Every structure is written in structure tokens, then in C-alpha cells.
């Protein structure tokens, strides 16, 4: 969420960014999507942990509603950097990641959205164990090479 919020801040400051590289970002102010309900318990990122993170990151309801915390609620995302978004299919955050990708696309922002099937939040750290993590590493690296005109 911080990286996505900073992309809007960079746009406002006139600082061109090459890419938003977002790996299972939290983009919403509330845990009210179907994926939050479906994956609230039993996997890596559970609802109590998300509530704990929210409670330790934002001090007030106003801060929680602020689009810089929850970029899905930004008034506009026109002109922000293109985005590569990697999501885990079995993650409470998957729906808000898809929603953020849709918001960017509706604003004309180029988006490459990858949903890695059958994996959970934190899968990107498991490159030695699961092929989806290795694929995500390769996909993210390729997105960076393209953004920096190295390919």
C-alpha cells in the first residue's frame, strides 16, 4: 500500500517513476472483500494479524480512510506510473489487488496483473520450494528490465 500511495505522491510532485512493482499489496482501508472472508483463517496471513497491522500502523479512523494508506480510495490515479502487480490466489488481499489494478486500468494506467494460482500470501519468499515463486521472481525481474529499458 505504501508503494502505491507513493506513486500518487510522486505524480503530484512531478517525479516520474518507471514502475510500481507491487507484490500482494494491501490497497483498501477495510477488510470487507470476499477474499478477506474466504481466507480469514487457516493460511499464512490471517484476519487477527491484519487487524494487528492496521492497529499498529494507523492511529485513527481518519488515517485509515486516507488514500495514502488505502490507495484504492485515491480520488484519482491518472498519470501514475505503470504497474506490475503480483498476487497470490489464496490471499485475503487478492480482491483489493485486483480492484486496484482495475482502478489503474480505468484511468488509462498500463497494468500487468499476475495472479499466481494455488499460493498464499508470502509465497514470493519461497523461491527454493515452489515453482510459482520462481515464476513470480522472473516476472517481476522482467517487468523491471522493461521499465528501465534493459530489454
Q: What residues fall within each predicted segment?
A:
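Alpha/beta-hydrolase superfamily serine-hydrolase fold, recognizing
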Residues: 1-151
